[in-house]
Amino acid sequence: MEKIRLGDLVEFQRGYDLPKNEFKNGNIPVISSNGILGYHNEVKVKEIGITIGRSGTVGFPYLIKQDFFPHNTTLFIKNFNGNNVIYIYYLLKSLNLNEYKSGSGVPTINRNHLHPLKVTATKNKETQQKIAKILSDIDDKIEVLHQINDNLSELAKTIYDYWFVQFDFPDENGKPYKTSGGKMVYNDILKREIPEGWEVKSLGEIEPNIITGKTPTTKDENNFNGNILFITIDDIRQNLFIYNSERTLSEKGANTQRAKFLKKGDICVSCIGTVGVIGIVGKIAQTNQQINSISNPQNFNKYFLLNYLDRYFKDNFTAKKGAVLDNMNKAEFESIIIINPIQNIKEIYYGKVKFLYKKIDTNIQQIQHLQFLRDWLLPMLMNGQISVE
């Protein structure tokens, strides 16, 4: 390893202007500082490349493994000078380039900030390839696990829709209920038919243990930075099962609000700011006041309600998009109308999907272990503390 000017390794160039109203129909991703902004019909970089946020979200590298159009909110690498593209990507990830931003308003970074930087790196192509392979193999495993989880989640939702939206759950003969002529009864509240024996209830009637989160006083710094998760909306966005949080509480801080404790299996739902982001607690936790949680849900209700609420919020709110939406207080959350099947049907559904969610849970834990391993290896591989010779 040696100290090298970043500009001697690669050459950065500012992205191209493309107002939103000038996008043309196409399949070429337009890469902005936040990722894919949209799609266009013009290629500016072929096959594979790297961008870095130039304004707004600054300094974070993106690896794009296809033709793309770099937006003017990014810098892109115009010339790799024969260096391994994947190695350069991980090198940039290790540099914390966000620290080099400038501007008191919207933060910016340009190539004049980056080219003079002295970085610890290697020009040896074989070493670059070995480092790139170690780290990319880990990321490839992570990507496969994410794809598996997406497929498992989609399967569970498909079963849910078939049973509880189309009402084609198996009848006593194992045949699809509604399609096979199962009796439907008109419901005055819903103004439509539902299967005979099903009820319309509020969420609070079905699961009465609803907890609204709270933040301990921030005047006492000893309330924070312990080993108890303090879940916010951003933490729920990361994974369905929540094992990590950006902030944590100490036992002292959590014990100032003991009624707010949640345990593994409780369901968290964001109800302020962005409404309808849903996750399942992975270990002992508390949440902030933007989240209502279903505490200690009965097993046969857990995944039924998870999918019911997910569909409810998608139908009634633009959830999970980061927009500021109408808030929902605890009373409104508890009053959400649920089409409640007979318990036996929910128990059979739980039996069918619990193994899918168990696998999702296991995969998430494996993903987080691999992410920890990658992030631990990254700086040591880049500065030569771990040899690949």
Q: What is each PLM-predicted segment?
A:
Residues K3-V10, V43, F60-Q129, S202-P208, ...:
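Basic, amphipathic alpha-helical recognition segments used for DNA target recognition
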Residues I4-I50, G56, Y62-K65, F69-N72, ...:
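Sequence-specific dsDNA recognition surfaces
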Residues G174-P176:
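Short, solvent-exposed loop/beta-turn-alpha elements that line the ligand-binding surface or hinge
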